[in-house]
Amino acid sequence: MDFTKEYLHSVMFEFKRYKTLGDTTFSQLSEEEIQWTYQKNENSISQIVKHIVGNMHSRWTNFLTEDGEKTWRNRDEEFINSYTNKKEMLTAWEKGWQCLFNALETLNENNFTSTVYIRNEEHSIPNAINRQLAHYSYHVGQLVLIGKMLKGEQWISLSILKGESEAFNALKFNS
């Protein structure tokens, strides 16, 4: 497999992994919990999702031909008003990820060396993708942490439980 295909396969896998972490977090939360904030000026899960989705639509719509910071995006608004309910949030979440996956599927050996722009700053394709992968992983980590704080003892872990690494590794290495 050549570098372009391997890289695109790898980032698609990682983006899907972070989407799954978000999906699994949301499945554990109520309508009220997605709106909860730690303090007055902090963001709720719903607001963070609105920001991620706004970023996804801006960055990945016409990825190869337009600046990633679209004139129609209102970033500040993403943090003011959140979704009115969980269903609305999940619908937007799915559309944001679909926009990203659709854009990645257009990439190939013929356009992989193109230059793209984000806020009028030149990026290689891998650099632009890595930038977004880092951005989304940062925010998904926030979503998971808030979910874990809210659920407490009822939280269903999304990773290897404390004290279970040895058993987990035994399964991985003995299979």
Language-model-detected regions and their locations in the chain:
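Generic detector of well-ordered alpha-helical segments enriched in charged/polar residues
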Residues: 8-12, 61, 90, 113
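Short secondary-structure junctions
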Residues: 26-30, 108
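Hydrophobic alpha-helical core bundles mediating ligand binding, dimerization, or RNAP-core interactions
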Residues: 15, 19, 26, 93, ...
